[in-house]
Amino acid sequence: LRRLPPSNRMRTVSDADGTRYLLLKQSSEASLVRDPRTGREQYLDNDQLESVDGESPLVTAASAVDAPVRRLLTATHNDRSLGLLVELVDRGPCSTIELLDSYDLCESDLHGLLAEFRAAGLVEEATSHGERGYDATDLATRAVDQLRTDS
């Protein structure tokens, strides 16, 4: 594999309004850029663009996905973990015992997933039927709702 020289690599640039683009091609007067939110490509004058140092073009590309959904995607590693989060969104607060009785997760796996979800801000501790449990946060609910309407 041959790496492109730094000047030919995709980079993040922004215009005067702060809108970020992926720089695809650059000539002496204009640059071909892509808006990561829309996928639309256009030529802009070089004097309208400024390089954004320290931001990976992959991070810029990921910005096309809303923050709640990105957070959900990074915290759920497989269908089981996604399913657990969807169930918490749909069922509301559930005690740890309810979760263990309802699903095919051992206690260690369940607590591991819930710890990851808590760290990501997707679940919070709650009480269900007088017992310690968990509930989905508004962030998780928005992300799941968005995925449901987009699919």
Language-model features, listed with the residues they occupy:
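Short alpha-helical segments that sit at the start of domains
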Residues: L58-L82, G112
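DNA-contacting interfaces and partner/effector-binding or oligomerization modules
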Residues: L1-V65
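DNA-binding alpha-helical recognition surfaces that contact promoter or target DNA
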Residues: V86, G112, R142
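Short amphipathic alpha-helical interaction segments
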Residues: D104-A119
